[in-house]
Structures are given as C-alpha cells and as structure tokens.
Regions:
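Recognition helix of helix-turn-helix/homeodomain-like DNA-binding domains
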Residues: 52-68, 93-95
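Short alpha-helical "recognition helix" segments of helix-turn-helix
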Residues: 43-50
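Short, charged recognition helix plus adjacent turn
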Residues: 2-9, 20, 88-117
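Long, compositionally biased
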Residues: 79-80, 104-133
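Key DNA-contact positions within bacterial/archaeal DNA-binding proteins
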Residues: 45, 56, 85
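Short, basic-rich loop-to-helix N-cap that marks the start of a DNA-contacting helix
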Residues: 65-78
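The alpha-helix within a helix-turn-helix
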Residues: 37, 48, 77
Length: 135
C-alpha cells in the first residue's frame, strides 16, 4: 500500500490524476477498523467491553450499519489504544471531525490517546476540566 506521503508527492508532481487514483486503495470505516483490530491483535468483543456503548449499537457501528458519533469512535480508539493518526483516520472515515489540538476538549482527548488512557481515566480528565464525559 502506498503511503500518504508518497501520494502527496505524486499529487504535487505532474503525474496524471487517473494514474494516481488507480493506486489509491478503497478505504472505508469498517475495513480500516478491522485492520486496526488485526494490527493490535484485538477482537471486537474485547474492545466493545471497554466502552460505554450498548453492545447492539457498538456492533452496528463496527459493522457499518449504524453511523458512530465522534464520541463513540473515540471510545473505540481508546479501547484499542490507537495513536492520534489512526484515531483521526477512523474519525475521517466515519464522517466525523478530526481531533484538533487547539480545541481544548480535543487537546484533552489527544493527551489521553497519546498516554494510553482508558475510557474511565479519559472521562475523569474531561470532567475535571469541565467537559462532558464521552457518551
């Protein structure tokens, strides 16, 4: 698979767009989530157990039959101990806004991701700084 940096380089050059589009993989939320689970050696059941989501809702989000809110996608990312890059990819592929360090709540979430906080510890941190817990 071609890296994002390589794609940006090609897009900046005079490479024909059709040639570039042919090498870009078809990415969707479900396949990216599955790849993250596989890379981390995790099962959906284990990850879902570490969230505040109802099991049915969580499985529907993971299977792509229901759109997950930003909070729910972040819960999955925390449970999988994803880094910021992978979390933002999941957020983008689920049509949610990316985490942005200049937004205070997002800065707290980035901090929690980078320090591998679980959902409980992340919610404590959010509440301590006058933000709602992830629901």
């Amino acid at each position: 698979m071609i890296s994002t940096t390589q794609l940006i380089t090609l897009l900046n050059q005079s490479t024909p767009l059709e040639n570039i589009l042919e090498i870009i993989p078809d990415l969707d939320f479900v396949s990216y989530l599955e790849a993250c689970l596989e890379k981390k050696g995790l099962k959906k059941k284990e990850v879902i157990a570490q969230t505040n989501m109802q099991k049915n809702d969580a499985y529907q989000i993971c299977n792509g039959t229901k759109k997950g809110s930003k909070d729910k996608i972040i819960q999955l990312a925390l449970a999988m101990r994803l880094n910021l890059h992978d979390t933002n990819n999941l957020l983008s592929l689920s049509n949610n806004g990316l985490l942005y360090a200049k937004v205070k709540k997002d800065a707290i979430l980035i901090y929690a991701l980078q320090h591998h906080y679980n959902l409980f510890k992340t919610n404590e941190l959010l509440i301590a700084h006058c933000f709602d817990a992830l629901d």
